């Protein structure tokens, strides 16, 4: 009978330790990822902000942007394939091109995470990246757009789409209005 109570006690201890590990893991994953964005001037010359520019005898949409990730959880988070999407009347039109680097060999600058638009965000941390997105007029799929959204995939490959700004996407050279402030991106 003594060995029976020892076995039951050991089994209860084993099950409770597994339960504690499961609860602890769930609590560590609690917490949100917040994304903030700041529209800035392009890196190389510092004179153009987001909008339509003349580029190599063609109009191009350019979005130089700082993106800040705030991981408020106790676990490492993954933000994969961060990109900007164009919308018209709530319908997705197309995605922009992620610019990996600018400059020449002597003055090379890598955007995002050394040219990659996927990020590993450490627990309870804030990380800022300088990114640049672009789309030439000849590559567009729609005549115009009225909204730009940011999209990423998390560590479970779930798609997240957040509103960046409402704009007049008529493909006429000029800058979009910008506040110069950090904005919290929301659905």
Residue ranges of model-derived segments:
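Membrane-aqueous junction of the first/signal-anchor transmembrane helix
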Residues: 1-187
């Amino acid at each position: 009978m003594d060995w029976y109570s020892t076995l039951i006690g050991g089994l209860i201890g084993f099950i409770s330790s597994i339960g504690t590990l499961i609860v602890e893991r769930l609590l560590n994953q609690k917490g949100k990822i917040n994304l903030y964005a700041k529209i800035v001037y392009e890196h190389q010359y510092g004179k153009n902000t987001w909008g339509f520019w003349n580029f190599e005898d063609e109009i191009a949409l350019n979005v130089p942007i700082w993106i800040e990730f705030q991981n408020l959880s106790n676990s490492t988070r993954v933000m994969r394939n961060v990109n900007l999407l164009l919308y018209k009347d709530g319908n997705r039109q197309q995605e922009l091109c992620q610019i990996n680097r600018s400059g020449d060999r002597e003055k090379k600058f890598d955007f995002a995470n050394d040219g990659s638009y996927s990020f590993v965000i450490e627990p309870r941390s804030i990380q800022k990246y300088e990114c640049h997105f672009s789309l030439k007029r000849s590559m567009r799929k729609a005549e115009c757009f009225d909204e730009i959204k940011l999209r990423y995939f998390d560590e479970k490959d779930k798609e997240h789409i957040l509103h960046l700004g409402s704009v007049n996407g008529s493909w006429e050279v000029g800058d979009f209005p910008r506040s110069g402030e950090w904005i919290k991106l929301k659905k």
